Amino acid sequence: MFKRLTIVLLLVVSGFSTALAFANNAEEKKLLRIFDEIWQYDMTRDPTYATYVGYPGQNGLWPDVSQAAVAADTEKRREFLAKLRKINRKRLGDDSLLDWQLVEKNLAGQVDSSEFPDQYILIHQRGGVQQGIAETLSMMPQRNRQDFQDQLTRLTNASAYIEQNIAMLREGLAKGITPPQITLRDVPQQIRNTIPEDVNQSPLLSSFTNFPDSISDDEEAALIAEAKRIITEQLYPAFNQLLVFMETDYIPNAASSIALSDMPDGTNWYNHRVKQFTTSSLTANEIHELGLSEVKRIRAEMDKVIADSGFEGSFSEFTHFLRTDKQFYMTSAEDLLRGYRD
């Protein structure tokens, strides 16, 4: 939800000064200033995303995932939503009104999401600090010495970030709020891959391999040596702490069920997710029934197409025929392009 809002705002505020100059009235200017305020806040709230979009000044930092920061963030988004809803929409042009609707919808969704403990779902096999730290370092700019100094600063701050993640994971575990155990199966090996015995093989060091010509060989060697020192003295112990916690406490006691509804207040949480991802007011059961009816309708239409074609055989035989008969395959790139165009 946060990423969707920042993408919307990126499109809106990327030409902020120009947009402000061409705003039709004071209300549209007020709206643009609110958008810019939200954007600036989001960039400081998530420094890793700020790095991703090229926002300056955040490259040495990590997000604050503490409970206090989560609560403060929710309150801030309530403030933004209240400001946004005070805008007189009757005075907005069509484009500005659409911008208002998109941002309002996303902010409202963020505030609604704060009723559920997503902040505890910080790690699984597809994401978490065991992958995210190295990934963030790899996408940082490498244009000059300051860029590499930012990487060193971010490396220095990473151990505290890992410890903060562990604290939140521990709190979530105590409350019975974890990802399904099966989604954590590969996490220990992912951690080990991040901290191999030979630090030169660590993905944490991979961003220190492509230096610009403006950095001398001596400076390059000094930067690499400092990176290795930080990684071995600070990050290796922090990741080992995470590894022990995952293997001895977290994974053995994580949720065995894959159903979100089995979590505390899970049914309401699941229904919220349904609304969030389908952007409809349909219930989970209504969506399930709709899916069944659509499958039945589509299958009936497919059976009719098979019957009308004159094919004699079962449905599975017909699909096998479609997959294997040469008449359904192009024999050249030109035929493929011609078939696409025609």
Task: Specify the residue positions occupied by each region the protein language model found.
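Positively charged n-region of N-terminal signal peptides that target proteins for export
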Residues: 1-4
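Bacterial N-terminal signal peptides
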Residues: 6-17
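N-terminal maturation segment of proteins
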Residues: 22-342
